[in-house]
From Swiss-Prot:
Pfam families per the UniProt record, alphabetical: PH_RBD, RabGAP-TBC
GO cellular component, one term: cytosol
GO MF, any single term: GTPase activator activity
Keyword Nucleus recorded: yes
PANTHER family: SMALL G PROTEIN SIGNALING MODULATOR 2-RELATED, TBC1 DOMAIN FAMILY MEMBER GTPASE-ACTIVATING PROTEIN
A GO BP annotation: vesicle-mediated transport
Superkingdom to which the source organism belongs: Eukaryota
Location of the Rab-GAP TBC domain: 411-633
Name used for this protein in its record: GTPase-activating protein gyp7
InterPro entries: Rab-GAP-TBC_dom, Rab-GAP_TBC_sf, SGSM1/2_RBD
Gene3D superfamilies: 2.30.29.230, putative rabgap domain of human tbc1 domain family member 14 like domains, Ypt/Rab-GAP domain of gyp1p, domain 3
Length: 743
């Protein structure tokens, strides 16, 4: 009988891209534990998911055998590899059934397969265990390697398909009369793996982040991991400093498994430490020489090591505020590019605990548990999908909410917008047939022509009505400076029809835009034309390429944005107040900083909200954003969450690199045309669900207090939720008075 000791020994090899494997004779190892239905999610599409087996196996230790886990391999093998190896597949299945390590049989571990890996436990620095939420979202793990600082592809446990997890969970419930694990989570595949790992390695759970475990930590790792000493140093520095730099919420962390070193808790320490450029030179030197800093530095990317050790960089950032701003913008650019390229894998795999777990503000010292909804971006609605949703009479035969969900999560193919936007802008009813829409179009076309004739054929009005002349001049001026880089408006190939105009040239598209806006001025006699409307009209005009349809699309959009253009600015005040309340409710630290910099009026968001981010995103990207906003899928005022997401994605720069109103305003203005849409939308959706869950938690605690307070004498510490905030959960238009106040 062959013993484990007689097995040929593997040599570890790192493979580029997504594969880390081992080289051993015949690639044979002895299997100890196996878990099926563990998936890699290469993209956001379910069809691309790759199923496989996660396993623990035995090999001979390399080097010092006293190191725990040096002879144990953690591996992932795709099902496709085992499909043509029935004997190996049987071993994996048997190991999963027993899952107690009593059967140890040789199996083959593949080499150079995409996403497959096999690493020694002693080579793993930490593992993030992210449990499922609501009982349906997949739990996942992220494995962070010790020497390279790399993270392996995130692994997702499809527990609803895994027989061993289902059966073991039932067994635990029977034995303990409790379906939860030690951390209070429902039993899931990651819990099963954790139980097995503890047999072969020392795992230390973070006191700051319960989902993070160090594997065989050294004393230096433990010190850096807990970060207590470094926190004391930073606290002392603050006491000795004349100006206290802002710090992030203690539990705020974003783990991105595709960025080197950012995933380790040591980077959380570094993130605190990186603000030393705000301290004096003595504090910088003191931190650089601290033993905790020295223990972390070797694990960081080379670029960061050079940056932190550079006295020239430290001196430059101490002497020149613009240098701090430049470095901050550079860092933001790196993050922006990374998230733009890897938005879905990053956000599916990371740990997003963007709010305090212990809230000590007006909510009282109770635990806030945010339930993470699955957030993903998908492919845009295609022509084929759209056509398949209608019957032979051209009537929608699927649920409208389903259609809106597809658009919300992926947008619309550009060639299809002309057909879909009329539904989103309430030009056509969702339950209409093709024939009914044809009749509606003809009726709307006639109504548009009638409205246009009211001013177009009134010569007296054109030359003597002072109000009309003023409005026409405003429209003329605005149209001639709207989107002049777009091909529709770029070339002036016609002489201006009015010889008295200050503009000598024009083109047909600009003239049609003027006509539509003058007709809208006739349609909405109360509001008329207000500067900024030309910015809103241009995308609709280019998309529809039909004057009547464009006009009624503009009417639909203005029903949504009417209050933005009121003379008393009450609508804009309401929106900015809502955004202000949202920031204060969700991120008190950021709100306090905005107050400190005299920026809590949020004037930096005025343009974004006024014209629906028209100047913040490039043309094609803007249209995709409008696809999302027009759906009202999660909220009628979802643009408030988009604005909040922009603030959150840039919060660290705002907190650490801005100190006055003009700096905040300048920073936001310079974001124009540089924002990445997909990460912003993912962040906005996460923020929405966090807001919704926090609101529900407060309401639940309010109800509990009310039920327990029979005589009504007990005062509550819970915050009062403003109506503006509650309106953010509505998917239909909230009712406001003409002054913009809520009825």
């Amino acid at each position: 009988m062959t013993t484990l000791e007689s097995l040929d020994m593997p040599e570890m090899t790192e493979v580029e891209d997504d594969t880390v494997d081992i080289h051993i004779d015949n690639s044979k190892v002895a299997l100890l534990f196996s878990k099926s239905k563990v998936f890699v999610h290469p993209t956001s599409k379910m069809k691309d998911n790759i199923s496989g087996y996660l396993s623990l196996s035995k090999s001979k230790a390399l080097g010092n055998s006293s190191v725990a886990g040096s002879d144990i391999l953690l591996s992932w093998v795709p099902d496709s590899f085992l499909k043509n190896r029935p004997r190996d597949l049987s071993v994996f299945q048997n190991a999963e059934t027993l899952s107690n390590g009593s059967i140890r049989e040789w199996v083959e571990i593949p080499q150079h397969l995409d996403y497959s890996f096999s690493v020694r436990l002693c080579s793993i620095y930490s593992i993030i265990f992210r449990p499922p939420r609501y009982g349906w979202n997949y739990g996942s793990i992220v494995i962070n390697l010790r020497d390279s600082g790399e993270s392996l592809p995130p692994l997702f446990f499809h527990d609803d398909e895994c027989i061993s997890t289902i059966e073991y969970g039932k067994q635990i419930t029977r034995d303990r009369f409790d379906p939860f694990d030690e951390s209070g989570n429902m039993f899931w595949g990651g819990t099963h793996l954790l139980m097995q790992l503890k047999k072969y390695a020392s795992l230390e759970q973070s006191s700051h982040e319960s989902q993070l475990y160090l594997v065989n930590p050294s004393p230096e790792d433990t010190v850096a991991f807990q970060s207590v000493e470094l926190q004391k140093v930073i606290s002392n520095n603050r006491l000795n400093s004349s100006s206290t730099p802002p710090t992030p919420r203690s539990s705020s962390s974003i783990f991105n498994p595709f960025r080197r070193a950012l995933h380790d808790l040591s980077f959380t320490v570094l993130e605190r430490f990186s603000r030393v450029t705000n301290y004096g030179k003595s504090e910088v030197d003191r931190l650089m020489e601290h033993k905790v800093t020295k223990s972390i530095l070797p694990h960081l990317p080379r670029e960061l090591q050079v940056l932190l050790e550079s006295k020239r960089v430290q001196k430059l950032t101490e002497e020149y505020d613009p240098a701090r701003m430049f470095l901050a913008r550079w860092a933001e650019g790196i993050v922006e590019q990374s998230e733009s390229n890897n938005s879905q894998p990053v956000n599916n795999a990371g740990v997003w605990t963007d709010a305090q777990r212990e809230e000590d503000s007006s909510l009282g010292p109770f635990e806030l548990v945010y339930i993470e909804e699955r957030v993903k971006r998908d492919d845009p609605l295609s022509v084929e999908q759209w056509n398949s949703m209608f019957n032979a009479h051209g009537k929608l035969q699927v649920d409208v909410h389903r259609v809106l969900g597809i658009i919300f999560h992926g947008g619309i193919q550009p060639s299809l917008r002309k057909e879909v936007w009329p539904f989103l802008l309430s030009v056509y009813p969702w339950d209409s047939t093709s024939e009914e829409r044809r009749v509606i179009y003809l009726s709307l076309q006639e109504e548009y022509c009638t409205l246009k004739r009211k001013w177009y054929e009134d010569i007296h009005k054109q030359f003597n009505d002072r109000w009309f002349i003023e409005q026409r001049n405003r429209i003329e001026k605005d149209v001639h400076r709207t989107d002049r880089q777009h091909e529709y408006f770029q070339i002036e190939d016609l002489p201006h029809p009015d010889p008295q105009s200050t503009f000598t040239g024009t083109n047909m598209n600009m003239e049609m835009m003027k006509d539509i806006l003058l007709t809208y001025n006739e349609y909405d006699t109360e509001l008329g034309y207000v500067q900024g409307m030309s910015d809103l009209l241009a995308p609709i005009y280019v998309t529809f390429n039909d004057n009547a349809l464009t006009f009624w699309g503009m009417v639909g959009l203005m029903k949504r944005l009417h209050f933005n253009f009121l003379r008393d600015q009450s609508g804009m005040h309401r929106q900015l107040d809502t955004l202000r309340l949202l920031i204060e409710f969700m991120d008190p630290e950021l709100f306090a900083h905005l107050e400190k910099t005299d920026s809590s009026n949020l004037f930096c968001f005025f343009r974004m909200l006024l014209i629906y981010f028209k100047r913040e995103f490039d043309w094609e990207v803007l249209l995709k954003l409008w696809d999302v906003l027009f759906t009202n899928y999660l909220s009628y005022d979802y643009h408030i969450f988009v604005a909040y997401a922009i603030a959150e994605r840039h919060r660290e720069v705002l907190l650490n690199q801005t100190s006055a109103f003009d700096e905040v305003l300048k920073y936001f203005n310079e974001l124009s045309g540089k924002l990445a849409l997909e990460p912003t939308l993912i962040c906005a959706e996460q923020c929405f669900y966090q807001f919704k869950n926090k609101l529900a938690l407060i309401d639940r605690k309010q109800m509990e207090e009310t039920n327990s307070d029979e005589d009504g004498s007990k005062e509550t510490d819970l915050p009062t939720i403003a109506p503006y905030l509650r309106n953010l959960l509505k998917t239909s238009q909230p009712q406001y008075t003409p002054s913009g106040k809520q009825e």
